[in-house]
């Protein structure tokens, strides 16, 4: 959806699909880590950022991608004519377009779980703000059903896209990816000043914001990064934060996409390192959840 690193600094993206059609890559049911209760999580495809630690590389491109699972391949060569003719299912498409009506029907299959657990629907990504108009219309529909709504976002978009969507949510899981402005700009391709401005705006508008801080060796797993985040959050009277330790669960996805992951040999944070970050936040008065 973007053509150069310079353009990838923000979510100033022209929505390329009709507003009643979205591009997603997964619907995950029975999630317990993306908001209150049992959640159905809709993962939108496309992200303007380039986080080296991304665990969902299939979410980055806004295009529908086709991958081949070598273990399933029969080497019959039928795919040379048409990948859809593959008899073994070795070819897999990542991403699909779905209408408002179809997505509404899909998530409402889980309504009984929402009502019995206090759960609901969470929109994640990729970056949901790249398809903000669709997402806003979709949550408006869910609100008519009385469904609890949440989004997970990095907040790097014009407030005109973020605020109407956030106001439909019971929770906004706000990813504070990195607090160093230079790394945010040059590595992650993120507009950190705007992210922080949007964070403050949401809080001032009464939105229930839950910041999420990734703990990434070499980037954010440091006292300095944590203190910078706390310095931003303390004046906002936010009481709850999530700490998300780095993991290697995404490594097979990079291989499937034919990509080399720069962090494939990076170890997860030690329990002692995570405890240090947690203690800093708790001493500052925050209720801390590790893992979301």
Model-derived features: positions:
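Cysteine-centered iron-sulfur cluster-binding motifs in ferredoxin-type domains/subunits
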Residues: 41-54, 66-89, 95, 127
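Active-site anion-handling motifs in enzyme catalytic cores
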Residues: 98
């Amino acid at each position: 959806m973007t053509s150069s690193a310079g353009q990838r600094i923000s979510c100033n993206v022209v929505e390329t699909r009709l507003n009643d059609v979205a591009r997603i890559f997964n619907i995950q049911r029975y999630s317990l880590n993306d908001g209150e209760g049992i959640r159905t999580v809709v993962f939108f495809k496309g992200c303007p950022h380039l986080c080296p630690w991304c665990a969902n590389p299939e979410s980055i491109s806004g295009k529908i991608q086709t991958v081949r699972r070598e273990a399933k391949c029969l080497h019959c060569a039928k795919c040379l004519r048409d990948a859809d003719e593959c008899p073994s299912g070795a070819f897999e498409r990542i991403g699909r377009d779905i209408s408002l009506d179809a997505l509404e029907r899909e998530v409402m299959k889980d309504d009984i779980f929402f009502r019995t657990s206090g759960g609901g629907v969470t929109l994640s990504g990729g970056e949901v703000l790249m398809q903000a108009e669709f997402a806003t219309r979709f949550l408006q529909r869910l609100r008519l059903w009385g469904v609890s709504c949440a989004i997970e976002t990095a907040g790097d978009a014009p407030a005109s896209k973020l605020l109407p969507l956030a106001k439909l949510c019971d929770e906004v899981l706000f990813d504070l990816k990195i607090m160093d402005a230079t790394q945010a700009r040059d590595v992650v391709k993120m507009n950190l000043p705007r992210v922080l401005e949007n964070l403050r705006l949401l809080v001032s508008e009464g939105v229930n914001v839950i910041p999420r801080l990734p703990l990434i060796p070499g980037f954010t797993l440091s006292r300095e990064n944590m203190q910078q985040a706390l310095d931003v959050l303390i004046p906002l009277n936010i009481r709850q934060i999530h700490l998300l330790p780095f993991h290697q669960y995404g490594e097979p996805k990079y291989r499937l996409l034919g990509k080399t992951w720069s962090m494939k040999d990076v170890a997860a944070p030690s329990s002692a390192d995570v405890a240090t970050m947690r203690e800093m936040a708790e001493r500052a008065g925050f209720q801390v959840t590790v893992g979301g």
